[in-house]
Amino acid sequence: MQDLPAGQAQQPFLTRSFFFFQYHFRESDDANASNRSPVSNPYEPDYDQLSPPPMLGAQRPVPEQNESSRDLLHSSYHGSIGQASYDQGSFNGHNSTYGVGGFGHYPPDLHGRLPGSPGYEYPEPEYDVEASRLAESRLSVMHRTPTMQEWSPNGETLSVSPDFAHGRPDSTYQEFDVDESWMMRQQQAQIGGGGLGRSKTRKVKLVQGSVLSIDYPVPSAVKNAIEPRYRNGPGSMEEEFTKMRYTAATCDPNDFTLRNGFNLRPRMYNRHTELLIAITYYNEDKVLLARTLHYTMKNIQDIVNLKRSKFWNKGGPAWQKIVVCLVFDGLDKVDKNVFDVLATVGVYQDGVLKKDVNGKETVAHIFEYTSQISVTPDQQLVRPDPDKPHRNLPPVQFIFCLKQKNSKKINSHRWLFNAFGRILNPEVAILIDAGTKPGPRALLSLWEGFYNDRDLGGACGEIHVMLGKGGKMLLNPLVAVQNFEYKISNVLDKPLESAFGYVSVLPGAFSAYRFRAIMGRPLEQYFHGDHTLSKTLGKKGIDGMNIFKKNMFLAEDRILCFELVAKASQKWHLSYIKASKGETDVPEGASEFIGQRRRWLNGSFAMSLYSLMHFGRMYGSGHNVVRLFFLHIQFVYNLLNVLFSWFSLAAFYLTTTIIMKLVGTPQVLSGYHGWPFGDMASPIVNVLIKYIYIAFLVLQFVLALGNRPKGAQYTYVLSFMVFGLIQLYLLVLTGYLVYRAFTGTPIEDQISFASGQAFFDSFFGGNTGVAGLIIIALITIYGLNYIASFLYLDPWHMFHSFPQYLVLMSTYINILMVYAFNNWHDVSWGTKGSDAAEALPSANIVKDEKGKEAVVEEIEQEQEDIDSKFEKVVWRALAPMSEMMEEKPEAKDVEDSYKSFRTGLVILWLLCNIVLITFVTTDDFSSLGVSKASDVRTPMYFRFLLYSTGVLSIVRFIGFLWFIGRTGIMCCIARR
C-alpha cells in the first residue's frame, strides 16, 4: 500500500539472473551491514559459489536503461522509519556496483560497453546449451523478485515488477519438487538453521507438563508493517505483533480446553469475539487461498471503517472483535506453495512444526498471529501506507490450524466449533471455503442479519459463478448452465425457503450460524459423520450407519440446517440475505462436473427423504402456529419436488417421444402434415432420434456402473453433445407446436367468455383447452423467471445463460442423476496417513536444571537469520503459479452390501419410470379397467405435469415477492 517514487514506479528494473532483490528493513542506518554473512543451507545451493546461469542461445534482449533506472539499481526503496523497504542487493546483502563482473562474470563487449548497459552484446555460450537448462531452472528462485504494489488513484493495487534480462521464468518450482523442498526446510532449524555456529537454544516450559506452546519472533518485515496507531492502540498487546505463537495439539478437538492447558490469544487478552470467520482448505492452490484470504481482510476493513455503527465502535476496536481461523485438512494434500503465502502474512514459519511431543502424535498444529499484510490473488504484496491510513488493511487476528492427517471437512468443523469456538465463544461463525471470494461488505451484511433478528439461527448469502474477464467463461456451455442454476436458485428458490423459515441448505462455501443456536443437538448430530469419532460413538458413528445415512453426510450442510430448525423448544429459523454476495469457480470439464454432482445429488436426495420422514420433530420445537403453518406448506412443496425428481427420467423420455410424434406424425383428421421433413421423412428421422436417445441412455448406465468420469471423459462429452442436440431439436418442435396452436384456430374461438364455467372449461380443460394450457406453461416456465429476474435487478443470466440451460436441461437427469444413483454405494471414509508428517522433527521433553519441570529445548535463531529466510519466502509467495499436477484417484474399498443397496435402488428407480412410460404410451390396459386409448391418457398426463409445474412456479414466485418486500422494509429499519 506504499507509494513508490515516481522514477521507480515508471522505469523498468534491469536485472540479471545472477542479481536478485533483497528484502531489507532499516530501523537504523544499517552501518553494520558489512559484517553480515550469508546464511548457509545444506538443502539449497551456496549462491556465492555458483557460476552464473548460462545463456540459452544467442544474445539476450536487455531492457532499455537510463540514468533514473540505473540509480534504482544502486539505491534502496525506503519507506518511513520502521517500515519495510526493498533493496537491489548482491548475495552478501549489500548493494552492488557496476563494473566487470557486475552481471555474473561477463566482460565488456567489443565496443567497451559494460554488462547491463544499453546495447551490450552478451558472448555466445561455449558449453552445452541443453545441459545448462536444468541449472537455470534450478536457479529460477534467484531470478524472482518480490512484486511490489502501489495504490492507484482509485485505490486499486498496481503491479510494479522488475524486468528480467533472461526473460521471466514460468515458475519458481518449474523442475524442483515443491513437496520435497518444503520437507527439507522443516529440518533446517533442527540442524542449525543459522549455519554460522551462533544459534542458541532455549528451554520452553510445557503448560501443565504436556502442552507445547512456543512464541517465535516474526521477520522484521512483518512486525514493522504494523502501524503505530494499532501497535500502541487501546487493548493491543506487543507480543501479538512481534511473536507468532505455535501450539502442538496432541489431543482430540473435544479435549482442546482450558482445563487441559490449551488457550488462544483473543481469550488470553480478554477480548470478546463477535465474529469468527472460518476458511476451510483441502488442496486449493495459493491463488485460490490468496483470493479468499485477501477479500476476507478487505471485508474486515469494511467493518473497521464503519463510522455510524452502534455496535462495532463501542467496547474496544472493531478488529479485536473479529478472528479469522484457517483450518487445513491434512499435510499431504496441501499445496505447499500456500505455506509461503501464509508465511508472508506472518501466520506460519518453516521449521516450527513438531510431529509429536514426547512420543505423543500431534493432531493439529496451531499458529496465532495478528497481521496487517496481505497477498492478492495476482501475487501482489499489500502492506500499510502511512500516508493513506484510511486505505490500509486493519490488523487481523489469525488462527491457523493445520491438521496433521486428512480427516475430512466435518472434522475441520469440529476443530472450529468444539475446540476454538468453545474457548472464544463467538456470537456468529461464518464459514467460507478456500477459493470463494467474498464480495464488498458481504460479511458485514451476513452479520447484520443476525444483529437485527434475534431468532435467526443461520443464514447464507448469494453465491454466483466466476465468469472471467468480460464473461469469457460463458463460452463454455457447462459454466453457463451452472451460472443459470446458481442465479435462479438465488432469485426464486432461496427467497421462497427463506419466506418459510427453513432454507434446506446453507452452502458450506459461504454461510453463517449463530454459535449458541447450533450448540447441543445440531452439532452432535452433525458430528456423527466425523469418522475420527467412529470408535467413540459406536453404532451412532459413521461405521455403524447404513449406506442411506452415509449418503446423508455427503450433504452435511443440510443436516445442520434441519437440526437447527427442528431444535427442541427453540424457534430458530434460517434466512437468505440478498445483500451478501460471494463468488466461486465451478467445474469446467464434464468429468469434474459429474463427480461434483454425484455427491450433491445423492446427499440432497437422502437428506430430503430424511427431513420428510422426521418432519414430526417440528412439533417439539418452539415455533409459533404461523411458522408451523408455513412449514407444512413447505413440507408439501418438498414432497412434490421429490416425487417429480423420482419420475423425471420417464418425464423427459415421454416429453421427447410424444412431441416428436405429435409434430412428425399428426392425426389425419387434423389437416396437418409431418414437420419439419415432410410426411415421409419426419417419422423416420424421429424414430432414429428415439433409438439414439435410448442407446445413449443405456450407455449412461454402463458408464456409471463401470467407469470413473475421468476415465471416460470423452464419452461423457459426446453424451452431453448428443442429448443437447436432441433437446435443441425438441425445442424447435415445441416452438412449432405453439405456433400451430395459435395460428390454426383464432384464440378467441378457443377460449369462451360466455360464462365463468365456459371460460374455465375452455381454458383449463376439455378437448379445446390447448390454448390455455400453452399460455399457463409459457407464463410459469418462462415468464415468471424473466419477471422475477428483472424485479431482482439481475436479469442478465436470462439472456446469456438461459438458452444453454434449455439445451442441456435433459443432461441433468439422463447423465448426472443416472451416474449419481448408480454410484450410491460410493462413500469413502477413513483417515489417510501423512507422509509429509514423517519429515517433521519431534519435541522431546526433558527436565529443567532443577530436575522438576518438563521443558523442551528449542533452537533460537538470530533475527538476521529469520529475515534472510523470509526473503526467499517472499520470492516464492509472489512467484507466478505453475500448473497443478492432476490428483491421483484414491483406491476405493467398498463393501458388497453397499453395492447391493445401490443395485436395489437403481432397479426400483428404473421400474417406477418404466411403469409410468408404459402406462402413458401403451394402448391396451383393459384387464386393469383402464381406457384402451393411449391418446386419451397422454394429454391427461401432460396436463397434470404442466399444471403441477405451474402451481409450484407460482408458489416460488409468491415466496419471492414476499422476500423482496420484506428485504426492502428491513433495509429501512435495520440497526447497524
Swiss-Prot record:
<comment type="similarity">
    <text>Belongs to the chitin synthase family. Class III subfamily.</text>
</comment>
<dbReference type="InterPro" id="IPR004834">
    <property type="entry name" value="Chitin_synth_fun"/>
</dbReference>
<comment type="function">
    <text>Polymerizes chitin, a structural polymer of the cell wall and septum, by transferring the sugar moiety of UDP-GlcNAc to the non-reducing end of the growing chitin polymer. Shows additive effects in septum formation with CHS1, CHS2, CHS4, CHS5, CHS6 and CHS7. Involved in virulence and mediates mycotoxin deoxinivalenol (DON) biosynthesis via the regulation of the expression of TRI4, TRI5 and TRI6.</text>
</comment>
<dbReference type="InterPro" id="IPR029044">
    <property type="entry name" value="Nucleotide-diphossugar_trans"/>
</dbReference>
<dbReference type="GO" id="GO:0005886">
    <property type="term" value="C:plasma membrane"/>
</dbReference>
<keyword id="KW-0843">Virulence</keyword>
<keyword id="KW-0808">Transferase</keyword>
<keyword id="KW-0472">Membrane</keyword>
<dbReference type="GO" id="GO:0030428">
    <property type="term" value="C:cell septum"/>
</dbReference>
<dbReference type="GO" id="GO:0071555">
    <property type="term" value="P:cell wall organization"/>
</dbReference>
<keyword id="KW-1133">Transmembrane helix</keyword>
<dbReference type="Pfam" id="PF08407">
    <property type="entry name" value="Chitin_synth_1N"/>
</dbReference>
<keyword id="KW-0328">Glycosyltransferase</keyword>
<feature type="transmembrane region" description="Helical">
    <location>
        <begin position="717"/>
        <end position="737"/>
    </location>
</feature>
<feature type="compositionally biased region" description="Polar residues">
    <location>
        <begin position="31"/>
        <end position="40"/>
    </location>
</feature>
<dbReference type="GO" id="GO:0004100">
    <property type="term" value="F:chitin synthase activity"/>
</dbReference>
<feature type="transmembrane region" description="Helical">
    <location>
        <begin position="684"/>
        <end position="704"/>
    </location>
</feature>
<feature type="glycosylation site" description="N-linked (GlcNAc...) asparagine">
    <location>
        <position position="602"/>
    </location>
</feature>
<feature type="glycosylation site" description="N-linked (GlcNAc...) asparagine">
    <location>
        <position position="95"/>
    </location>
</feature>
<feature type="region of interest" description="Disordered">
    <location>
        <begin position="29"/>
        <end position="72"/>
    </location>
</feature>
<dbReference type="GO" id="GO:0006031">
    <property type="term" value="P:chitin biosynthetic process"/>
</dbReference>
<dbReference type="InterPro" id="IPR013616">
    <property type="entry name" value="Chitin_synth_N"/>
</dbReference>
<feature type="transmembrane region" description="Helical">
    <location>
        <begin position="944"/>
        <end position="964"/>
    </location>
</feature>
<keyword id="KW-0812">Transmembrane</keyword>
<feature type="transmembrane region" description="Helical">
    <location>
        <begin position="903"/>
        <end position="923"/>
    </location>
</feature>
<keyword id="KW-0961">Cell wall biogenesis/degradation</keyword>
<feature type="transmembrane region" description="Helical">
    <location>
        <begin position="801"/>
        <end position="821"/>
    </location>
</feature>
<feature type="transmembrane region" description="Helical">
    <location>
        <begin position="773"/>
        <end position="793"/>
    </location>
</feature>
<keyword id="KW-1003">Cell membrane</keyword>
<feature type="glycosylation site" description="N-linked (GlcNAc...) asparagine">
    <location>
        <position position="32"/>
    </location>
</feature>
<feature type="transmembrane region" description="Helical">
    <location>
        <begin position="639"/>
        <end position="659"/>
    </location>
</feature>
<dbReference type="Pfam" id="PF01644">
    <property type="entry name" value="Chitin_synth_1"/>
</dbReference>
<dbReference type="InterPro" id="IPR004835">
    <property type="entry name" value="Chitin_synth"/>
</dbReference>
<feature type="glycosylation site" description="N-linked (GlcNAc...) asparagine">
    <location>
        <position position="66"/>
    </location>
</feature>
<protein>
    <recommendedName>
        <fullName>Chitin synthase 3A</fullName>
        <ecNumber>2.4.1.16</ecNumber>
    </recommendedName>
</protein>
<keyword id="KW-0325">Glycoprotein</keyword>
